[in-house]
């Protein structure tokens, strides 16, 4: 169903999208800030797609190959804007990506949803909700976009209040890429704050390979706003994506403290990039000292999980057996399937394969230590021998 005046059209959402929006608005996410992770991740993907397409058509850059994500907010207007200069979307793309879920078996899948939120959140795991997570914090969302390589008058504006329909119209947009404007509801207003945004970006997007910047406004002596400027918040290069030969021991040790919140240096570590059936990088550390609750089997353990440099979760215990629960570090996979909130890993062959590889890697490190450094291995055994015996 659609109703059109000139180039403005009102279209109904596919029924499954309505269900998904209902779940977002009555949020199955305990953690509201992840909307930002999802939207920045999408912006990063749009940049990756542009980079890929520009390999065969450099004109798509339109003279600007400096890709990035920019965030700005307006407290008076109650809006947060996330902008990228990636691949952008045409009108057809917008209808396909923001009005429907174009996946086979969708209706059958949604018919299985119950009213049990925890079960639904796991079921929905076969879906990427990405963009729709904006409705966790916003009561209306406006998207302004233009596909790379298209004329400036071929921009598109999409708007929805998360109910049954959305409007779409043609606009003129000077720059390629996508602006997502969130009209924040009451519980989203905490994100209209420079320091809160920096905190979330630092937490989830530090290791995305493109700059994420915030429009920062300083105050003068009278407390009035001075001229603002774009300020890059993330590091924009993940340590584990760098070549091992370029990373100093001190950097590995510092990074260990960052991921483990430990104050001491680790005993040893292993950094590996694997390409083949599964593409992933692992950076695994063996600590020098056991935490005080080591023998508690409910002790939070596991690796940090990233997918394509985007932080997904802490304590992903699926990649280590419990007898190696002292291992710290991360795994960065290019092809893991994740559930909707990315908080529960699907138990599948990829997960099992990575678990097996990481386990072998750790046991190999310990074997090498036992052969080459008695003193270090003795330190390890005193701290973790009892746990290792569980295996």
Swiss-Prot record:
GO terms for molecular function: ATP binding; ATP hydrolysis activity; ATP-dependent protein folding chaperone; unfolded protein binding. It comes from the Bacteria. SMART domains: HATPase_c. Keywords: ATP-binding, Chaperone, Cytoplasm, Nucleotide-binding, Stress response. Gene3D superfamilies: 3.30.230.80, Histidine kinase-like ATPase, C-terminal domain (3.30.565.10). Its main location: cytoplasm. GO terms for cellular component: cytoplasm. Transmembrane segments: none annotated. PANTHER family: HEAT SHOCK PROTEIN 90 FAMILY MEMBER (PTHR11528). Homodimer. Molecular chaperone. Has ATPase activity. Belongs to the heat shock protein 90 family. This is Chaperone protein HtpG.
